[in-house]
Amino acid sequence: MGKLVLVRHGQSQWNLENRFTGWVDVPLSDLGIQEARKAGTLLKGMKFDQAFTSKLQRAQNTLKFILEEIGQKDLPITQDQSLNERHYGALQGLNKKETADKYGDQQVHIWRRSFDVPPPKEKTDLNPEGISESLKDTAARTLPYFNSRILPLVKAGKNILVAAHGNSLRSIIMDLDHMTKEQVLELNLPTAVPVVYDIDASGKILKKQELN
């Protein structure tokens, strides 16, 4: 049996400012650092074999503070863009109230809470076609990586720690818990609260708990 621990990053500066963040690489807030360290204290006594995180510093630093607290600063870490947050397209950087004022509450609610409707695309010189993701798009990016790189280690009896983001982790939990797309839309992951799965060699979940 292996353990899989999923942790959403601590509060970021843009969480604090109520902005759409997505792939923008913003730091943790002071509270976010405290939350990450608290997550570490909740995981003390657990020995990990490997950690995975995204390419964004708020997840990487959450992992760093957790590993400091549990005394495993030398744990092997793999960073991959597959675990990045959902890309919020042209909404990235906008205050959520300002966005609602601009587009209307109902439209913003659809972008945030529908499974397969992405926000308007963000177009740049490097990407003139533009990019944005729905939760469905995020899952299509995250799940193949999780199922090929992370879950096999857990099924082999390893203890694995994943520090990532609300929507990439929702995608993983949706798959593990066999949730419908309607159910996953109601799933809210608080910042820096570890979710612990005990998983056997067949991939069956033996136990799930939140540590808070």
Give the positions of each predicted feature:
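Extreme N-terminal starter segment of soluble prokaryotic enzymes
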Residues: M1-V5
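ANL superfamily AMP-binding
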Residues: I33-M46, Y145-L151
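Glycine-rich N-terminal loop/short-helix segment of MobA-like nucleotidyltransferase
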Residues: S12-D25
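GST superfamily/GST-like fold recognition
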Residues: G166-S171, L206
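Short catalytic helix/loop segments, enriched in acidic residues and glycine
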Residues: G22-K38
